[in-house]
């Protein structure tokens, strides 16, 4: 018995798209047993991989000669997932034994999937410490497909500084069309007799606003007339993969049920649009064409007051009347930016000389409620009468209202959202040009151009959004945290109020040691996306600094219940027990985080700080070195190594590691502060004061920096300057015992014994056991000249005060933790 391949393939893709992986695997195994082809092999391996069985896909593909680009890419993907990096590299680029393939060779071999191939190869290079080659692969991947975000993200994380303005742009229609799925280009090609893309190169403005070139409309009448073959049937892409079953292959056995279904549209970048107030200005792609007797299929465009009439094979038409409908709110993906103004859309109503049951004008339904058998999309549908027909060549279109122009209020909103004013003007020029084309009665001539043109317009809005987000993320990876907060805070509200953006802002506040603000942002993330795990390790550390044990306990419980395979959840649990001073349990949880993800650098760092607290310095050194091995730009681990060497009084090594951390994060006042302390220990007191002054310039209210500067001044016998510094510090941290203790020592040196005793008494009252300091690094004996002090309790505090028992009610020791002080 022979199994027909195409129906089985369609059934497999339908099962995959409905997450019925067991059914998909079973059918794919039957198909591969019947047809031993590369296509069936790839389909079976895809089923294995999507069902989470990468090792099965790897062994299947490894046991057969993979010659097609699809199979090669999937095999390489499996190798990377299984940590077989060398094998994955050899599959993609040739490796050591074969000739190394260039980027152009990869583009030629893999075609449209070359951008993903290069991104995967770049990941392999970066994991094997070949950052320069990895950077080249990422950049080439982005040049092929600017819609990819992860290559840009990876470039920022390895220390590169890609220019978002040059990265997220579209240079031509040809380049743009290569980034889209086959179904998108099929929309244009299937509507033309020649089945060709228009050879139109779209010029680029600084913000990717495209102006339509002067087209020779008369000469193109014969090339781009719009006719639709009635035998063409669009098949739901959720049922059949476009790579295996072309959309224009005739009526499908899988789409019989669509005969009585209202005409629906699928939202995609650009194209004709019929939008609800809740959806972005993406277009509606037809999922099926009208039947020969049904000419009610309508198309309309946002920002383009035109009617795109699809000819019907039914009775001849007489006349066409244009009606106005309104779309709802436009999103950032529309070319005119974040305008909330409604834009008029033309909806054509036609009358036929043939039999018809109704002459009621068909208008765009404002509701967003889909019929029961429609696809579950939020975008609104076109509901039209089954009996009306569409005119084939409309010569006269009447506009009842002119299109609205964004008013002053809209412009101000647009500018705030990061979409510049020239975009609006260029968009209006496009609209005017489209209007003039319609008035000349040549709409059927340039329909393919307009369709591609609207795809480009919608994509330009997405590019503008990605540019702004890219600038914010680049600033954050460069530790320009204030700039990152400013850029991300000016994103459109509906993008700002998402988990990813808020997590980046929360992380920026965390790096600035503004823990109260960070906690506020992260709590908002938890409110709007309670399922988000990414970034919650930073939230847990924030709560640790703020000593909010209840909130931290709730967070860790929720995360571990939700996903026991995420390292973030176990880091939160470890922080929870660390706050309770249960260091042994915390160590076990941090080790569990590493077990779950051995490439998670932050877990190594937290574990290292925990070992420091238990005085297991050798284990702590190993943890910090592992963190650096996983991520050389993880400055927290460099800081941890510096702290250990400082404890061991290896001051030169400590300074070197602190300096390495500062090279990664030059905006950290805490790192500068520690470098100043080490320099003073190396008898470089003047240089230490300069370094501490730089730290205070960056953060004038950093109590740790001011405290250390006062200590250095005191050690250099500049008592009056030290006293002035301590009086200012007392205003910032009025309940810090060590401040009063050092003030007492200054007064004693000045010979004012009564004031010295008074401050010593206050220090004892504030901290009778020396266990509740807010500034963890106390005065070290090496700071002070040799003298006999009657207060011995505070002397004990000096060398031992590096525990986690601090009360974080003021913004003091938070500064220390911003650079991962003694813990993180």
Swiss-Prot record:
The keyword Chaperone does not apply. One of its GO terms (biological process) is protein branched polyubiquitination. Residues 349-362 have a biased composition (Low complexity). GO terms for cellular component: anaphase-promoting complex; centrosome; cytoplasm; mitotic spindle; nucleus; spindle. GO terms for molecular function: protein phosphatase binding. Pathway: Protein modification; protein ubiquitination. It is found in: Nucleus; Cytoplasm, Cytoskeleton, Spindle. InterPro entries: TPR-like_helical_dom_sf (IPR011990), TPR_rpt (IPR019734). TPR repeats lie at residues 84-114, 115-148, 499-532, 567-600, 602-634, 635-668, 670-702, 704-736, 737-770. Residues 252-262, 297-306, 363-372, 381-391 have a biased composition (Polar residues). The modification Phosphothreonine is found at residues 205, 209, 313, 367, 431, 447. Component of the anaphase promoting complex/cyclosome (APC/C), a cell cycle-regulated E3 ubiquitin ligase that controls progression through mitosis and the G1 phase of the cell cycle. The APC/C complex acts by mediating ubiquitination and subsequent degradation of target proteins: it mainly mediates the formation of 'Lys-11'-linked polyubiquitin chains and, to a lower extent, the formation of 'Lys-48'- and 'Lys-63'-linked polyubiquitin chains. The APC/C complex catalyzes assembly of branched 'Lys-11'-/'Lys-48'-linked branched ubiquitin chains on target proteins. Homodimer. The mammalian APC/C is composed at least of 14 distinct subunits ANAPC1, ANAPC2, CDC27/APC3, ANAPC4, ANAPC5, CDC16/APC6, ANAPC7, CDC23/APC8, ANAPC10, ANAPC11, CDC26/APC12, ANAPC13, ANAPC15 and ANAPC16 that assemble into a complex of at least 19 chains with a combined molecular mass of around 1.2 MDa; APC/C interacts with FZR1 and FBXO5. Interacts with RB. Interacts with FAM168B/MANI. Interacts with MCPH1. This is Cell division cycle protein 27 homolog.
